[in-house]
Amino acid sequence: MKALMKDFSLSAVVAGFIATVISYAGPLVIIFQAAKVANLPHDVLSSWVWTISIGSGVLGILLSVRYRVPIIIAWSAPGSALLVTMLPDITLNEAVGAYIVSSVVVLLVGLSGAFDRIINRLPAAIAAGMLAGILFRFGTGLFVSVKEQPWLVLAMFGTYLLFKRALPRYAVLAVLVVGVTITIASGELRSDALVIGLATPVWIAPEFSWQVILNIAFPLVMVALTGQFVPGMAVLRNDGYETPASPLISSSALGSLLLAPFGCHGLNLAAITAAICTGRESHENPSKRYVAGVSGGVFYLVLGIFGATLVSIFSAFPAALIAALAGLALLAAIGGALSAAMAVPSDREAALITFLVTASGMSFLGLSAAFWGLIFGIAAHLLLGLRKPIPAVASPPAVGRKEQPAR
């Protein structure tokens, strides 16, 4: 504690606060969308918010202090996006069973130290194609929502473009402020839905179904490892932190496993928001930036305790605002995934197949588009990567050589 107080700085605290606010401004919206399409009860949604907030806060504080590195733990936004399409077709108990299975798999990967080996075997373009396909509907949803409330959505879109040009780090936060301001000014806010209350965890007994495990657990594992831990570790490495990956993965997976029966779909390393805390904006001295990780964890805890209030706040806003905010918050992720999917010429076609299958929303044999996207993509990668046999070329006839008469 003495070392923490000695290294304390206002800039690091502000960095942690901004990282937390941006986490709630964007990815949390997707969870509300998933809960809405699945018609989850208010107390279950409140418990879901409580688990991901408390889990992120506790792990962020402990890991930041332990390794003296600004570590931000967050819930998986792509994983939440996957649940938007899957939750309406399964029971909540089956979903929790899939959460447990995915957490166990990620935990085993972390404990075994096999993270690097697994990532090296899975083509990055295939993983990126699946991620882009999962997120695709949120990008299109942004523009579909223009029909419902054109002035609100277009104002948010314009704000996003302006801030992306001038202050890209605060673009999503600015979009949220503009959207909320317009909603309140136009009288669209449902003030009767606002309540003040503390969140309480709700136990959900798990049920296990092989179809649900393949549909949800397998894609969640892939998304966590390739879409969260890989870029999360890249952010740390980029700013000079050589923290080992295995304990970070194992700790996140263990936290996810313990909180899964209360609705937690998965905790992992943050990437975009983590960059706010690992850079110079947090502190000039890299060894003191871990305070930003602790700060972010504390803010997560505070907001998690008042999860019921957060749920009611988001429920009071129009659906168009939520859809537009989710789409804008994920634009960079969609663009990055598409760029990575098309980056390697030899894998481009396989990645495109993965993207198209996943984005199609198809279902076959009870298995989801995300699962089939990986299967079709990997199959295409293997088949297209086979070396074509070199056809035998006949030797050209000798020129100017006379035939020898037969004897």
Regions found by a protein language model. Name each.
Residues 1-46, 173-245, 393-407:
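Helix-loop-helix hairpins and the membrane-proximal interhelical loops
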Residues 2-6, 12-31, 50-131, 243-331:
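Helix-loop-helix junctions within the multi-pass membrane cores of secondary transporters/permeases
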Residues 10-13, 155, 214-215, 250-254, ...:
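Alpha-helical membrane-protein architecture signal
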Residues 21, 25, 38, 62, ...:
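Structural signal for hydrophobic packing residues in well-ordered secondary-structure cores
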Residues 82-83, 159, 235, 277, ...:
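Buried hydrophobic packing segments
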Residues 88-194, 295-394:
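Membrane-embedded alpha-helical modules
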